Amino acid sequence: MAQHTVYFPDAFLTQMREAMPSTLSFDDFLAACQRPLRRSIRVNTLKISVADFLQLTAPYGWTLTPIPWCEEGFWIERYNEDALPLGSTAEHLSGLFYIQEASSMLPVAALFANGNAPQRVMDVAAAPGSKTTQIAARMNNEGAILANEFSASRVKVLHANISRCGISNVALTHFDGRVFGAAVPEMFDAILLDAPCSGEGVVRKDPDALKNWSPESNQEIAATQRELIDSAFHALRPGGTLVYSTCTLNREENEAVCLWLKETYPDAVEFLPLGDLFPGANKALTEEGFLHVFPQIYDCEGFFVARLRKTQAIPALPTPKYKVGNFPFSPVKDREAGQIRQAAASVGLNWDENLRLWQRDKELWLFPVGIEALIGKVRFSRLGIKLAETHNKGYRWQHEAVIALASPDNVNAFELTPQEAEEWYRGRDVYPHAAPVADDVLVTFQHQPIGLAKRIGSRLKNSYPRELVRDGKLFTGNA
């Protein structure tokens, strides 16, 4: 594999020599950093099983190498990488997989290790959504996830990825992660804090990642990380699991942050060793039981993961003085909910008891039941999925609901050809050789729902959201 020139400050190299265990070679570290990062994907098991995905993609000649810590994760090599971007494949557009760096699959693996089955989870720094979508898949869209993102510009990307992957159990918030300890104390069974960091582990993806690096900056970042982990720990219920992770390599932002938490709450913090997380995990194991992944160990990004348990309650933080404001939704009454459920089922949309109908003016929404305890405590940017808008003639079903709830086996499902599916993704109407009978048509490709169309004569009127429409070359090879 070709090499690329990485910028290394001298002080960084000195720090790495001191931080690296004697069992590892510093020359191997430098060599690994100079190699471009291997690409990796994670199969979205909410949409397709790993076995079916491998069968579906077998004709493409992709080389898929299993990732040891994530059974649905694979390193991927494609001979036609330049001909068609991975994100323009049909399987990516329909949410069958997520392009995710291999080491970033580690935190969620740790969160669910040893049979842990949390029902209410928070992802404190969630964008662009790789870990939130991984958590949702592990929960099988049940329970509830609070996915928070401080950066306003990244919340939109987070929602787009959640929607593409067919996820229904997520609530989005846009806050500084330091507010949650006071706002929602002891409310979560599990919390993932993939903390903002100096990014020392990402040089294989970004050779200039360390251009602005300094020891002083690391110390400032670590101070913020201590505040974030303290807040997260307060939001965790006693008995709950907290996973702390970064994509950086210095001890100040990693081990030291976790040790600070234990020193602060010595009777409430228990480190849960990760040496048995997957075969070979002991190669990255620290004396505290954390995983400190230098890039040469598994030929991936540099990463750090710690798992801990909250063994008892800790003193509460002062109650916040802000007002959340009135919640603009009201629950739909049972009789009306039954009528809506029946109408939705007629176009192939079904949901279970984990979701409950709420209404705002003419909008119908489905919220995860597990998030209702947080209503009135935090302000949501977006909650659950928008099911429909009501109008005089019935319901206007929403695209995100189709992707999350539709059964491709519905009687009104209509399978498109590759050329027709590509036209659909370009936002164009489709003219099939034999038009379906129904007026409301669940459009599928590769037996996956990709939208809802209105039949007008021999034409299927496109309802694909304008913001998702794709230009350029797609999966049939036509521009």
Swiss-Prot record:
A GO cellular component annotation in the UniProt record: cytoplasm
One Pfam family recorded for the sequence: YebU_pre-PUA_dom
Major localisation: cytoplasm
Family: Belongs to the class I-like SAM-binding methyltransferase superfamily. RsmB/NOP family.
Source lineage: Bacteria, Pseudomonadati, Pseudomonadota, Gammaproteobacteria, Enterobacterales
Alphabetized GO MF terms: RNA binding; rRNA (cytosine-C5-)-methyltransferase activity
Protein name: Ribosomal RNA small subunit methyltransferase F
Class of enzymatic activity (EC top level): transferase
PROSITE patterns assigned to the protein according to its UniProt record, in alphabetical order: NOL1_NOP2_SUN, SAM_MT_RSMB_NOP
Catalytic residue positions: C247 (nucleophile)
Cell compartments where the protein resides: Cytoplasm
Keyword Manganese tagged: no
Enzymatic reactions: cytidine(1407) in 16S rRNA + S-adenosyl-L-methionine = 5-methylcytidine(1407) in 16S rRNA + S-adenosyl-L-homocysteine + H(+)
